[in-house]
Amino acid sequence: MKLTILGAGAWGTALASHAATAAADHDVVLWGRDPAQLAGIAATGVNATYLPGVSLSPRLVCEPDFDRAVDHALTDPEGLLIIGTPVSGLREMTRRLAARRKGPLAMLWLCKGFEAETHAMPHQMVHDELNALGVAPGEIEYGVLTGPSFAKEVAQGLPCALTVAGTAHVLIDRAQAAFHHHAMRIYGSDDLIGVEVGGAVKNVLAIATGASDGLGLGLNARAALITRGLAEMTRLGLALGGRVETFMGLAGMGDLILTATGDLSRNRKVGQQLAGGKTLDQILADLGHVAEGVRCAQAVAALAARVGVEMPITRAVCAVLFEGLPVADAVSQLLQRDARDE
């Protein structure tokens, strides 16, 4: 099975390494925008920029030429293309892949969030681009691979379980053939809306939980934020067309728990450091990586307003990030909300 992962960040690299190790017949290529970075990975077996100190599969092949990397997967009728860029790069990648295809194409993306300008979900962005290009339904099957997963742990071969949701079951079958090996479990879903809402909203809620922990508010407060945050996520997802069971699964509750409590979470770190008095600009400069919760917080709040869903925790995060509200004041406002039924 031939696979191409487009994007040599932490998650793209980790997944490529796992796939290369997963089965003897897997032929995996990793492409990235920086040829020097790819050369370093090929020479040392380590992605020193995003996964320092973690040894990658020796069977992983780095390919700096985009067309050759894409053609690698396209030459296999059972091949799979994985887009490992942030949400902001998804439209461009979709256009480039559609232009390169020679027949049916199967692709997945790894990004989580909503588009900042349009508030579109990733699958809506892809659908719009393919429709504008005149691609007929079924010519390109697409979907998302998501769930509770830190890239470093995946690259280290530690156990995890993920969800793949797509436009056709053949895509789920290919994703399971590619990744459902050794320590990784892949579960299928047809609820693209639900899994994408879960993947976006959990990042915003992780900022809130990190801020609570940064203020030293305790484990009770953490549990309350996660639980009430899950309620916010579910309300929004149902209003947008998702299914309730999705939010009780890996792409909802599972990803929220991991991102809100795990110390490898960039979004959690943002909240902790905001509580510690750092400015958002300082925090993002220090991180050096994408924190999707910051990027999509306003989009989540705008979507909620559009469909009439109340999301007080999300609104508080936006006020802290973009309106200068001190973290302690945001907590105070949440605690002063009127009593209500759960």
UniProtKB/Swiss-Prot annotation:
Coiled-coil annotated residue ranges, if any: none
Keywords associated with the record: Cytoplasm, Lipid biosynthesis, Lipid metabolism, NAD, NADP, Nucleotide-binding, Oxidoreductase, Phospholipid biosynthesis, Phospholipid metabolism
Function comment: Catalyzes the reduction of the glycolytic intermediate dihydroxyacetone phosphate (DHAP) to sn-glycerol 3-phosphate (G3P), the key precursor for phospholipid synthesis.
One GO term of the biological process aspect: glycerol-3-phosphate catabolic process
EC number annotated for this UniProt entry: 1.1.1.94
Catalytic residues (UniProt): K202 (proton acceptor)
Compartment(s) of residence: Cytoplasm
NCBIfam families: PRK00094.1-2 (NF000940), PRK00094.1-4 (NF000942)
Key word Nucleotide-binding present: yes
GO molecular function: glycerol-3-phosphate dehydrogenase [NAD(P)+] activity; NAD binding
PANTHER family noted in UniProt: GLYCEROL-3-PHOSPHATE DEHYDROGENASE, GLYCEROL-3-PHOSPHATE DEHYDROGENASE [NAD(+)] 2, CHLOROPLASTIC
Protein name: Glycerol-3-phosphate dehydrogenase [NAD(P)+]
Gene transcribed to yield this protein: gpsA
Protein family (similarity comment): Belongs to the NAD-dependent glycerol-3-phosphate dehydrogenase family.
Mitochondrion keyword on record: no
Pathway: Membrane lipid metabolism; glycerophospholipid metabolism
Catalysed reactions, as listed in the record: sn-glycerol 3-phosphate + NAD(+) = dihydroxyacetone phosphate + NADH + H(+); sn-glycerol 3-phosphate + NADP(+) = dihydroxyacetone phosphate + NADPH + H(+)
Gene Ontology cellular-component terms listed: cytosol
